[in-house]
UniProtKB/Swiss-Prot annotation:
It comes from the Eukaryota. Component of the ubiquinol-cytochrome c oxidoreductase (cytochrome b-c1 complex, complex III, CIII), a multisubunit enzyme composed of 10 subunits. The complex is composed of 3 respiratory subunits cytochrome b (COB), cytochrome c1 (CYT1) and Rieske protein (RIP1), 2 core protein subunits COR1 and QCR2, and 5 low-molecular weight protein subunits QCR6, QCR7, QCR8, QCR9 and QCR10. One of its GO terms (cellular component) is mitochondrial inner membrane. One of its GO terms (biological process) is mitochondrial electron transport, ubiquinol to cytochrome c. Residues 19-64 have a biased composition (Acidic residues). Pfam families: UCR_hinge. This is Cytochrome b-c1 complex subunit 6, mitochondrial.
Amino acid sequence: MSFFRDLLESVVPTAYAEEPVEDVEVEQPEDAPEEEVSEETVEEEEDDDEDDDEDDEEEEETADPLDTLREECTKTAACKPFDHHFHECIERVTKEQEEPDYEHKHYKEDCIEEFFHLQHCVNDCVAPRLFNRLK
């Protein structure tokens, strides 16, 4: 019978919940002095925080070349009309959403088509430049 039990356990593993951890309170005698935090310890902790902030600033300075290339390509002559149509559509949809009967309209315009045209143009412009920079 143990063979079948072992076979079943190997196919269908059983997980057991962990036993609850008992909270053990450490009692301190009433006449024992409490630990005092020295000024040196506080100053050291502040210095560590400043070092962490400097590291974060260094990381933020390195910009993603893809984002900068996308912005540049959006402003090119080839992609400018697509960007213009996309922003016009956004304005039109936003204005339409402010109308009182917008919720009851049968057709609600979105700017997905304009967005995809813009992204297609930007991606065609970015791809060769990005791979040259990454080499």
